[in-house]
């Protein structure tokens, strides 16, 4: 009498071994609505612990909202030829610089609207070396907010609490 339930349980367990879930994630309709933004390599960013422009580009690309265009190296004080950036397909351009001063890094950044030929944002902060990456995330947040109208979440932290 006990062998029948045991056999049924064994059969169910053997059948379950072969079963596995396949997870498939599709992101549709993102590429046609992406905002093209050019992000220049920040002047002297190789002196900082974090490569500012690389962090910013990665944040914007991973959001799915932006199509990042490589702008090469530029300084935040360089003259901007808006028609050149429009012809390259960029709706916005982010430029910046990083300078070390007394053990801190002065990070400067500007965001331009290439269609309206106008400056949208500027930011300048002196940060400790360990916060250069966080500053890059904050710049990505600012770009996200200025171009979408929604607050960015790249510099936020996620907390997971269990009871």
Regions found by a protein language model. Give the residues of each.
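N-terminal signal peptide c-region/cleavage motif recognized by signal peptidases
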Residues: 16-18
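Residue position within the beta-strands of beta-propeller blades
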Residues: 95, 158-161
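Structural signature of eukaryotic scaffold interfaces centered on beta-propeller domains
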Residues: 141-154
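Bacterial N-terminal signal peptides that target proteins for export
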Residues: 1-8
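Amphipathic beta-strand/beta-sheet edge segments enriched in Tyr/Trp
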Residues: 23, 78-142
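A short, compositionally biased domain-edge/stem linker segment
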Residues: 21-29, 144-147
